[in-house]
Amino acid sequence: MIAGIKAPDSTIARQAEQYAREYSSDVLFNHVMRCYFFGELFARKRGVKVDHELMFVSAVLHDLGFTEAGKGPHRFEVEGAHAARKFLLDQGVQEDRAWQVWHNIALHVGDLNLFKDEPTRVMQQGILYDLTALPPDLALDPNNVAEVLHHYPRLGFKKGFLEIFTAELDSKKPYPHRFHLCSCIEHHRSHALNIPKPEDFLGSAPFAD
């Protein structure tokens, strides 16, 4: 029990956590676990009913694309979604449920998950809370946050996560990701589009490291 939240104890939840633990560094594993608990805290704060198992599996497997389990030529969130779906199907999870997890993971980079159903939105907010500054109305109880950090410390996450991204970019040249067409047009048309430095994006998170 962490901050009044108990992670699901189903067979597939335990298997997913073990799989993420096996392939992830300490920095990455602690990140995905924090994301789950932060998402649950947002769900509790907003009174949103969630499928706890689906949210847990989606959260703990969402960065497999940075690991050996999700190696491949495509960008990391797509490779991670493929790896998670294959893992779930291999464990006997139903096809439609495995696809739900695929969508949650493949769309977690950017803002698309924030426009989906409420359970997906709070899961995405949990991920974003660990990464960057969020509006004041999305603040969480500091005592609950501290309890999550006690169990899953950040271990220099801001620097460590940037290094993980750098290694991902170095492994795939040219990187297989395209800017949104509207972003490209606005950048070349007005040169006013703000593209933040990664150090500023990650550095804005409300944590020391």
Summary of predicted features, one role per range:
Residues 13-31, 63-67:
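Active-site flanking loop/helix segments enriched in acidic
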Residues 53-70, 80, 101-111:
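His-Asp-centered metal-binding catalytic motifs of divalent-metal-dependent phosphohydrolases/nucleases
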Residues 2-3, 23-48, 93, 110-209:
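Divalent metal-dependent phosphate-bond-processing catalytic cores, especially two-metal-ion Mg2+/Mn2+ enzymes
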Residues 35-37, 75-90:
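An active-site-proximal "capping" alpha-helix that borders the catalytic cofactor pocket
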Residues 84, 88-97, 136-137:
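Inter-helical turn/loop segments and adjacent helix faces that build the functional surface
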Residues 67-75, 92-93:
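Short coil/turn segments at secondary-structure boundaries
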Residues 30, 50-54, 75, 79, ...:
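Alpha-helix N-cap and coil->helix boundary residues
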Residues 1-17:
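Short alpha-helical hairpin
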